[in-house]
Regions:
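Short, flexible, solvent-exposed loop/turn segments with mixed acidic/basic and small polar residues
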Residues: 52-55, 90-95
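Short, surface-exposed beta-edge/turn micro-motifs
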Residues: 58-61, 98-101, 137
Length: 167
C-alpha cells in the first residue's frame, strides 16, 4: 500500500500525539519542515528503587521534513536547522539526563549520495559537567513509494516507528 507524503506525516503525528506537543507547519520554520513534536519527561531518581533522591529530566525533539527529493544540500540544511532549534530548547541543568533530536525525512526520492550521508551522520554532545547530560541525533530518511529507507546508527528506532505508524 503506497501512501503520499502528507498521509505519512499525518500518521506519524498521530503516533506522537499522545505524549508529545505536536505542531504542523511551524510558522517560523523552513518550507521543508512539515511538523514538530516535543516531549519533556520528568521522573524520579531513586536509589535501589526505593529512596527518591531527586528528579531526572529528558527530552525528545522530533522534526519531520517533507521533501520531494532529498539532496545532500537539503539534508545538511535541515539537520543544521533541527540541531540549532533543539539546542535552544535544551536546559542542561543538574537534573538533565539526556535529549534526543529525532529527524525524519519523508521523501519521494532520496539521492544515492544522501543515503550514504544519512548512514554516516553521527552527532553526540556531552555537556561540560557529566551530571548535565548529553544530546544525540537520530536520523531516518524514507521514500514513501516503498523505496529507500535508511537511518544513522541511532535512528534505526525511527524506521521502526515509521513502519508501525505508516504501514
Amino acid at each position: 500500500m503506497s501512501v503520499t507524503r502528507e498521509e505519512a506525516i499525518e500518521r506519524l503525528l498521530a503516533h506522537y500525539q499522545e505524549p508529545y506537543r505536536c505542531a504542523e507547519r511551524p510558522a517560523t520554520a523552513s518550507p521543508e519542515l512539515a511538523a514538530t513534536a516535543f516531549m519533556h519527561l520528568v521522573s524520579d531518581r531513586k536509589i535501589l528503587s526505593l529512596a527518591k533522591v531527586g528528579i531526572v529530566e529528558s527530552d525528545d525533539f522530533v522534526y519531520i521534513y517533507s521533501v520531494e527529493e532529498l539532496t545532500p544540500e537539503v539534508f545538511d540544511r535541515c539537520c543544521t536547522a533541527a540541531l540549532t532549534d533543539a539546542f535552544k530548547r535544551v536546559d542542561p541543568n543538574p537534573n538533565h539526563n539526556f535529549s534526543l533530536v529525532s529527524v525524519f525525512f519523508i521523501c519521494d526520492k532520496v539521492a544515492p549520495e544522501t543515503t550514504a550521508a544519512v548512514k554516516k551522520m553521527k552527532y553526540h554532545k556531552d555537556y561540560e559537567n557529566p551530571e548535565h547530560g548529553w544530546v544525540d541525533l537520530r536520523l531516518a530518511a524514507v521514500e514513501v513509494g516503498g523505496g529507500t529507507r535508511c537511518a544513522n546508527p541511532m535512528g534505526t528506532v525511527l524506521l521502526n516507528i515509521y513502519q508501525a505508524s505508516v504501514n
